[in-house]
């Protein structure tokens, strides 16, 4: 299905980038499209499985990671997109 949902924190951070830094916002949007196209573990942003939970991460830039989960229906839940994991 590949629908996107956000946690409250993930949505607040996504809106932050949309209003404060268009370059980072565009990178996040590119990563989201890539996740939809290639799945959790392939594509840009050096995707990796997180050890602490069932999620995944991709590099937005040196300081920020896109953290997400994919459920059994292939829906993508954005957990965070600001900071490095739980910073």
Predicted features, each with a name:
Residues 1-4, 9-17, 22-26, 59-65, ...:
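Enriched for short, Lys/Arg-rich terminal
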Residues 33-59:
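A short, surface-exposed loop/turn module that caps and links secondary-structure elements
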